[in-house]
Regions:
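Cap/insert and terminal regions of metallo-dependent hydrolase folds
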Residues: 33-133
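Acidic, two-metal ion nucleic-acid-processing modules in DNA metabolism proteins
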Residues: 30
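Short, small-residue-biased leader/transition segments that mark boundaries at the very start
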Residues: 1-6
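Conserved beta-strand hairpin/beta-sheet module of binuclear metal-dependent hydrolase folds
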Residues: 9-27, 44
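Short, basic and Ser/Thr-rich N-terminal targeting/leader segments
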Residues: 7-9, 129
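Short, basic/aromatic-enriched C-terminal tail that caps enzymatic domains
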Residues: 131-147
């Protein structure tokens, strides 16, 4: 499914096999109802949690790049990743991986804690502890889950 990223043919993925489905959603910028619809009822999801907004704002990137990252065609912040996740959670979701973290504008622990806080405090019936949420590692294989 197409995303809003500012590159050539940006896409997210939804892979289905029988009754099971997994999704990969990075380079989102902002999300809309179309993206939410493509990511609903997944068994597992790799979701972009690219940056902490404050770290990006005070970081070393030039102004134009900060504006692009924060814009509709940029990257999804930790906070917005958590808010999107609130709309996607359901009782049968088996795994959530946070990915595409910025090396300069994020920390694994910060992404995890921010997303978990958004889920726990968000407008949904779940708490973050109800799900296996983990940060996808850059340099090694993440936990393998069966869907």
């Amino acid at each position: 499914f197409p995303t809003r990223r500012s590159s050539d043919l940006p896409v997210g993925y939804r892979v289905e096999c029988g009754e099971h489905s997994v999704g990969i959603a990075t380079d989102l910028g902002k999300y809309n109802e179309y993206i939410v619809g493509n990511l609903q009822n997944l068994d597992a999801l790799l979701l972009e949690a690219n940056h902490d907004i404050r770290m990006l704002q005070v970081g070393k990137y030039p102004y134009y790049l900060k504006q692009r990252i924060l814009g509709d065609r940029g990257h999804l912040s930790n906070e917005n990743a958590g808010r999107l996740l609130c709309r996607l959670l359901h009782d049968n979701m088996k795994g959530i991986f946070l990915g595409h973290l910025s090396r300069e504008n994020n920390y694994e622990e910060l992404a995890y804690e921010t997303v978990c806080s958004e889920v726990t405090l968000g407008d949904n019936p779940y708490k973050s502890r109800d799900f296996r949420i983990q940060v996808a590692q850059r340099d090694c294989i993440s936990e393998v889950i069966t869907v």
